[in-house]
Amino acid sequence: MKIHKCSFCGADIPPGYGIMYVRSDGTVQRFCSRKCFVSAVKYGRNPRKLAWVRKKKAKTSK
């Protein structure tokens, strides 16, 4: 099974978990949590400007 990366925060998503979102142009985005999904799709936030994303990326990169 393939482990995917979250399109918003970059966290690993194990098989069977997360949200898969397909845009109208056919682009597939995968999210590890509803928090990432809503931040990206509903609010259109930039992950580089959010402190919790930077902390999560630093934690997963170790």
Swiss-Prot record:
Family matches, as HAMAP family: Ribosomal_eL24
Q: Which InterPro entries does the record cross-reference, listed alphabetically?
A: L24e/L24_sf, Ribosomal_eL24, Ribosomal_eL24-rel_arc, Ribosomal_eL24-rel_N, Ribosomal_eL24_CS, TRASH_dom
UniProt entry keywords in alphabetical sequence: Metal-binding, Ribonucleoprotein, Ribosomal protein, RNA-binding, rRNA-binding, Zinc, Zinc-finger
What this protein is reported to do is described as: Binds to the 23S rRNA.
Q: Which PROSITE patterns does UniProt cross-reference here?
A: RIBOSOMAL_L24E
Residues the entry annotates as binding Zn(2+): C6, C9, C32, C36
> For this UniProt entry, what's an example GO CC term?
ribosome
Q: Say if the entry is tagged with keyword Cell wall biogenesis/degradation.
A: no
Q: Which PANTHER family match?
A: 60S RIBOSOMAL PROTEIN L24, RIBOSOMAL PROTEIN L24
Q: How is the cofactor bound?
A: Binds 1 zinc ion per subunit.
Instruction: Tell me how this protein assembles.
Output: Part of the 50S ribosomal subunit. Forms a cluster with proteins L3 and L14.
- Molecular function GO labels: rRNA binding; structural constituent of ribosome; zinc ion binding
Q: Which cofactor does it need?
A: Zn(2+)
Family statement drawn from the similarity comment of this UniProt entry: Belongs to the eukaryotic ribosomal protein eL24 family.
GO BP annotations, alphabetical order = translation
This chain's source organism reads: Pyrobaculum calidifontis (strain DSM 21063 / JCM 11548 / VA1)
Name recorded for this polypeptide: Large ribosomal subunit protein eL24
Looking at the keywords, is Transport present?
Answer: no
Cite the residue ranges of zinc fingers (C4-type): 6-36
